[in-house]
Amino acid sequence: MSFPEEKKMKKLPKYRQIVHFIKEKIGNGEWPIGSKIPSQRTLAKDFQVNRSTVITALEELMADGLIEGTMGKGTVVINNTWTLMAKNSAPDWDQYVTSGIQMPSRKIVQEINQSESNTDLIQLSKGELSAEIFPLAVMKEMMGKVSQHMEAFGYEEPKGYLPLREALSNYLKTIGINVSSSSILIVSGALQALQLISMGLLQRGSTVYLDQPSYLYSLHVFQSAGMKLTGLPMDNEGLLPENVHLTRGERGRAILYTNPCFHNPTGILMSKKRREEILAVSENTQLPIIEDDIYRELWIDEIPPYPIKTIDKNGHVLYIGSLSKTLSPGLRIGWIVGPEPVIERLSDIKMQTDYGSSSLSQRVAAEWFTSGHYQQHVEKVRQQLKVRRELALSALETHLKEVATWNIPKGGFFVWIKILPSISMKLLYTKALSKGILINLGSIYAQEKGNYIRLSYAYASLEDLQKGIYELGLMIKELASR
């Protein structure tokens, strides 16, 4: 739309602006036939009008034969300006988008993902460091250094930028993992590591054993590749390995995923003894392990036990690390450590997928490690997280003591809060969102028993953190009194 047209549109009544907006989306092919249009609530919020204005606009579009409201399905596009005049209809894109290999996220997860970018909301569950902690000045310095020395901006070798892999090899030695750069693959975040494993190492019908609850249940990485998830119970020391019982058919068709340091979502830190027990089960059953250790550096009270990979002498463990939680998710830099044949296989798949992670990001990451700034940064992050954790725990004690219980995490981002069983969690989620607070319910992580919330003390400003917990306490008490 040109600037004069934009000015003209702003002079129209609000309902006409909504009509024009929807017609433009349909006419441009952005919302093809079968597409579900935004809800009345969303449109009212976006255009800053009441719902009656939105209803007026939708009624006009229905009269024009462009949209149709169906009970239980919302309002969908049934025609476009071409098909009203032409004999040939557009492809049924709705059928296509429901036929892809990748399974869609649950509706509540999609809503959370969209809402996490809304700066008007208090993000009480977001698993990311606050902008208040982000080292902007040092990041600019690192990027400046990298840009001065770059002679080209092409693809890197399949396993990733060699100086970064060499820097990671040195870094990993500090936590007891002795590997060469040839056993390290650079990936675009830990999630891509899991996707590569699902595509390259497991066949359809394989079993993925994992902690339950788990962050993995909010995704469909393995299920979309035709695998099934089998949850294993946890206690306060982590996953209970005695519950791993491989059938004869699962040997060679199963893998164990675990998140031992400051587990997402429970915050549990796996004990040294439990790590040894899990590796023993792995060795006895020939069950490979995926060790997702992205929160390791975020310890607050004491240094965590060494990774399982440290005591793995026979190549049973694939170790995943990342800068997304400790430095910046925007860099999209993570790594997998494993036996060389596995790394060769995964690097080949990665090349077929995206031809390598960002060259610029890899160079910036290498600069963080080789300059010594990374270790200085994570020490500051730990100090900030300690302040935030104490603030959150104090606010919880003040405002939720009567209606909830929780753990005290030794590091990471999360407090796992158990709410009174009488509370409707769906109603609490909706009520919180209407008051400008976004929370992640335990159900999205396959927490089957009890009412849980994953609370993050890492992202919201200190003021919003206190305000959000205060409001959450009021809402829970109100629902409990009904």
UniProtKB/Swiss-Prot annotation:
Its cofactor is pyridoxal 5'-phosphate. Keywords: Aminotransferase, DNA-binding, Pyridoxal phosphate, Transcription, Transcription regulation, Transferase. SMART domains: HTH_GNTR. The keyword Transcription applies. The modification N6-(pyridoxal phosphate)lysine is found at K325. Pfam families: Aminotran_1_2, GntR. GO terms for molecular function: DNA binding; DNA-binding transcription factor activity; pyridoxal phosphate binding; transaminase activity. It comes from the Bacteria. The keyword Cytoplasm does not apply. Signal peptide: none annotated. Residues 40-59 bind DNA. Residues 12-80 form the HTH gntR-type domain. One of its GO terms (biological process) is biosynthetic process. PROSITE patterns: HTH_GNTR (PS50949). PANTHER family: HTH-TYPE TRANSCRIPTIONAL REGULATORY PROTEIN GABR, TRANSCRIPTIONAL REGULATORY PROTEIN. In the C-terminal section; belongs to the class-I pyridoxal-phosphate-dependent aminotransferase family. This is Uncharacterized HTH-type transcriptional regulator YdfD. It comes from Bacillus subtilis (strain 168). The gene is ydfD.
